[in-house]
A protein has these predicted regions:
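Mg2+/Mn2+-dependent nuclease catalytic core
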Residues: 83-226, 382, 388, 392-393, ...
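Short helix/loop capping segments that flank catalytic or ligand/cofactor-binding pockets
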Residues: 21-22, 128, 277-281, 319-320, ...
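Activity-critical C-terminal alpha-helical subdomain
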Residues: 471, 478-497
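Cysteine-cluster motifs in flexible loop/terminal segments that predominantly coordinate metals
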Residues: 14-19, 239-300
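Short glycine-rich phosphate-binding loop at a beta-alpha junction
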Residues: 452-459
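Polybasic (Lys/Arg-rich)
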Residues: 209-263
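Metal-dependent nuclease catalytic cores that hydrolyze phosphodiester bonds in DNA/RNA
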Residues: 1-115, 305-310, 315-343
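N-terminal accessory regions of nucleic-acid-interacting proteins
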Residues: 297-380
Length: 497
């Protein structure tokens, strides 16, 4: 069986052409199928969903069939219909199937003829902010648009199936202003694989009271969803909600290429694009199919440097003007502007464009700038690299969702005579311990033996140090002032700190 599910609807909104390529997954390569980062993000989502279910106890789970090849939408919907005959009921993964549209809701709470439709997401928010979902410009905040249209689709399908019911849509999100009131909250929800290699979560509590205070926030989004349905909010200027449902349902069921106009942001991050390591393999590139169809590109054109990999290029107007190759660009197209004493953003872009256009493979070195920078270095040179974690369900009492946890660093020294020394390292493997303050104290001891210049592996290290500084300020640890002074001496403030 096939249908337009909510995941397919979401994918189709990103670009309707993607839905055609995912329809034909045996033909087209998809980089997201092998992305470990996305798999890790999904694991956090599974944990939050299980945590959310416990806030609505007594629910009945509509379980997936063990064999995904016999996934029967109608059977799942029939199970849901049977449960809805009860006056009051809580259902996890309720299923609704009508007119080739299929959705499953994370949590459904039925009381008489009123239904709460609750979509659980691991995304965080501060509920006190006034413009979380709709900005001051009266438009949906772009980062929330996929979630809100997903919720609108679920509400729409549920109303089609239950026209006499009142449906209230909610997003259940992580409240980043709340703190865990128990230790080990994250570890109550263990991510595991079943024998069929499907990801699940094992819940390791006997009673909901073990979870402490609820760190989720439930937001009623009836008004926003209604405006999406009415066409007041659109995903694209030329496609309202009902048009999107019709178009994407047709693509899904009829399996045709919609020839949706290529758009810079979607094409730049298209998951159906093959990199050099995948070239020559059996599966085809959906990205190439689009450009051969819409722009009549030949295989030779794909070898020409395009605008899609120009560093930090974000202007969609270039593509709208038909400027797709670096060879077509002029300095005016990227608003070229020099900066005193450093390489500006657009200078950096133009260097890349010129060199690739002219087949110039020599490295660019700002010799004067580099020399001026190196003249400020003090030996020995210190190199630090951090390993950290950030999770929606905190590990420790008093910590907020998505707070940074720094559990490991390595420290190497480059001496003036050329010697490289692996000088220090730290790793905290103590279960249940909050490592951050011990981490930075160890780092202070490692780096306070001389005045050598400190190099961080990336901006990540600076971000972590600032996050720990914020945590220290809110703590009563005896050495807080010394550690804060140390952090301020080796880092620079960020927008959040």
């Amino acid at each position: 069986m096939i249908a337009l599910s909510k995941s397919r609807f979401k994918q189709g909104l990103e670009c309707p052409n993607k839905l055609y390529f995912s329809n034909n997954k045996e033909v087209y390569y998809n980089v997201k199928n092998n992305d470990p980062f996305l798999q890790a993000l999904a694991s956090g989502g599974f944990q939050v969903e299980e945590y959310a279910r416990l806030q609505y106890p007594g629910g009945v789970l509509i379980e997936d069939p063990q064999d995904r090849k016999i996934y029967d939408y109608q059977d799942l919907a029939d199970q849901t219909s049977e449960l809805l005959k009860q006056e009051n009921v809580v259902i996890y993964e309720a299923a609704f199937y009508i007119d080739d549209l299929f959705i499953r809701t994370d949590v459904l709470v039925k009381k008489g003829t009123h239904i709460q439709l609750i979509e659980v997401k691991a995304k965080s928010l501060d509920p006190s902010e006034n413009y979380n979902f709709v900005g001051k410009s009266k438009k949906i905040v772009s980062s929330w648009k996929p979630y809100l249209f997903d919720l609108a689709f679920q509400t729409y399908v549920t109303k089609l199936c239950l026209p006499t019911y009142t449906i209230t849509p909610y997003l259940c999100l992580v409240d980043k202003t709340k703190s865990a009131t128990v230790d080990g909250l994250n570890q109550f929800f263990r991510v595991k694989k079943d024998p069929n290699n499907r990801t699940g979560v094992k819940v390791k509590i006997d009673d909901i009271s073990q979870l402490g205070e609820n760190i989720l926030h439930q937001e009623n989004l009836s008004e926003v969803v209604s405006k999406i349905h009415n066409g007041d909010y659109t995903y694209y200027d030329n496609l309202n909600f009902h048009e999107a449902v019709k178009l994407l349902s047709e693509i899904r069921m009829q399996n045709y290429y919609p020839n949706w106009p290529a758009q810079f942001s979607a094409c730049k991050k298209c998951e159906f694009k093959k990199d050099d390591s995948e070239k020559g393999k059996i599966k085809q590139s959906g990205f190439e199919y689009c450009f051969k169809t819409q722009y009549q590109w030949t295989d030779k054109d794909f070898k020409n440097p395009t605008i899609f990999n120009v560093w930090d290029l974000k202007d969609p107007k270039l593509m709208q003007q038909g400027l797709l190759f670096k060879s077509q660009l002029t300095p005016e197209d990227i608003k070229y502007k020099e900066a005193a004493g450093k390489l500006s953003r657009t200078e950096r872009q133009w260097l890349q464009i010129e060199k690739e256009r002219d087949n110039d493979f020599t490295e660019f070195v700002d010799i004067e700038g580099l020399k001026a920078e190196m003249d400020t270095w003090v030996y020995p040179l210190h190199f630090i690299d951090f390993e950290t974690s950030t999770v929606p369900l905190p590990f420790h009492t008093g910590r907020k969702p998505y707070e940074q946890i720094a559990f490991q660093y390595s420290h190497h020294i480059y001496h003036e005579d050329g010697r490289i020394e692996h000088a220090n390292e730290y790793i905290n493997t103590t279960a249940g311990a909050f490592p951050n303050f011990e981490f930075v104290e160890s780092l202070q001891q490692a780096l306070s033996k001389d005045e050598g210049t400190i190099f961080k592996f990336a901006t990540h290290e600076n971000t972590i140090l600032n996050a720990i500084r914020t945590q220290l300020k809110a703590s009563d640890t005896p050495k807080k002032e010394s550690l804060i002074s140390f952090i301020e001496a080796i880092s620079h403030p960020t927008n959040d700190n």
